[in-house]
UniProtKB/Swiss-Prot annotation:
HAMAP family registered for this protein in UniProt: Nuclease_YqgF
Annotated source species: Lactobacillus acidophilus (strain ATCC 700396 / NCK56 / N2 / NCFM)
CC per GO annotation: cytosol
Name under which the protein is recorded: Putative pre-16S rRNA nuclease
Function per UniProt: Could be a nuclease involved in processing of the 5'-end of pre-16S rRNA.
Record-stated family: Belongs to the YqgF nuclease family.
Keyword hit for Magnesium: no
Entry keyword Zinc: no
Subcellular location: Cytoplasm
Phylogenetic placement of the source organism: Bacteria, Bacillati, Bacillota, Bacilli, Lactobacillales
Main localization (coarse): cytoplasm
Classification via NCBIfam families: RNAse_H_YqgF
Molecular function via GO: nuclease activity
Amino acid sequence: MRLLGLDVGSKTVGVAISDELGITAQKLETIQIDETKYNFGMRPLKKLVRQYDVDGFVLGLPKNMDGTSGNSVARSKAYGKRLEEKFNLPVYYSDERLTTIESRRVLIEDAGMHDRKKRKQVIDQMAAVLILQNYLDLHRKD
């Protein structure tokens, strides 16, 4: 089962993909979106769905640290609903608390990426990888 992991922000969507066995997640790209112009990145996602023969999506749910839901959760669920309607594929959700912070730490400490501009380009993809990998790990059938 091949899944796309998405880290949906207000301006970008980080995209990761699972391998065909659903074991590992790899970063793919960052898609620019503009909600004010109703550009939700569906065209590039459609291309990826076709290219990789995707079976579904995993979206991060940006819950508050105390577990409550805020506006960002509602936005993520609305994006998920849009994906379901557009692609007729299942959408799963995964807690994304701290994924952006963890991505930043990995890029700075582990990869030595101190250039802020370069890091910004990759951080959404890394967050998508963490969201997807967390989901895959929780749902792995050993």
